[in-house]
Amino acid sequence: MNRVGIFRPIGAALLFFILLPALPSRAQEKLRIGLSSVSATNGSVWVADEKGLFRKYGVDVEVVIIGGGGARTVSALVAGDIQFSVGGGEGSIRSQLRGVETVIVASSFTKGLQRIMARPEIKTYQDLRGKKIAITQFGSAGHLALLLMLKKWNMRPDQVQIVTFGSSPAMLVGLDKGAADAAVLTIPTFFLAEDKGYRIVGDPVTMDIFYLQNTLESMRSLLRSNRDRVLRFMKGYVEGIAYFKKNKRESIEIMQKKLRIQSQQERDVRYLELSYNLLASTLYTEVPYPSVRAIQTILDKLAEEDPKIKERDAKSFADESFIKELDDSGFIKALYAQ
């Protein structure tokens, strides 16, 4: 008797039930998710929305742009204007330290999108001593990335000159005009800088540096009172990551639409494809557990301002139970088996 032949239909049936969406009769329930910026890093959320992956599990989701960084999205979360936010995570940690019941639910990736791009004469990080390094603003994700890289190199912040330029395009102009010797750039701007001949001298992805990027945050009260609804939302969220990683053409088209990049702008479309490749192959994680290691990085930074923060447990700032349930049930594994 062919035992493999017997078990194949059983395996197929199990896969069907694991991925079975919410019944159509279930009323669609509105949830709003706020994004801190318009960025390619939001690709998986846009894909989940555009491909109807939240509706598939009986949840009506509206994706809104809050802007103004993580602090503003956390404020909108606390006010009840949104039920979930996607941002850098530090805002949620700061609010929790003040006693506000925000919580980190997932981290789609935890290694930085920033790279230090330097003028051609700067060969290695050691050549950065005494040089002007541009960031957007103090307290930004790029500023944190720079501080972490300097620490990894056993360099102090006062051994370089940190200057602010407000935006990635402005920093690139600063490099061109010699107003900065290096700049902490993000996607897709560092691809443009590389094309112009600037050199990569620091990349957190290759330096084993973890910090919060693209964290999904919510309120503990919502998680307690609406666990089933949140779990269904999370199914759409993690399936969005899987769809993004597995469907390059459609994902790029959705990002192109959201970023308002016209098809005739070949250079911009090329940079968008490079951004997709980096996100899909290197950054996005299949099982987006909240990263305790990345949370600890933020706590260590904040402990420089308040030593008492060293006593806090990084695990207490996150609720991994939703991702764990989807992981343990085989739901996430099944998404990649299709």
Predicted regions located by residue number:
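Secondary-structure end/capping motifs
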Residues: S225-E311
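Pocket-lining segment of extracytoplasmic ligand-binding domains
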Residues: E90, P169-Q264
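Bacterial N-terminal signal peptides that target proteins for export
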Residues: M1-A12
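Short, glycine-/small- and polar/acidic-enriched structural segments
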Residues: A27-K177, D181-I187, I200-P204, I209-F210
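Conserved C-terminal helix/tail region of periplasmic/extracytoplasmic solute-binding proteins
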Residues: L299-Q338
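Short linear loop/turn motifs
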Residues: E62-I65, V269-A280, D313-E325
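Phosphate-coordinating loops and pocket residues in cytosolic domains that bind phosphorylated ligands
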Residues: G130, D195, D319
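Bacterial N-terminal signal peptides
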Residues: I10-A22
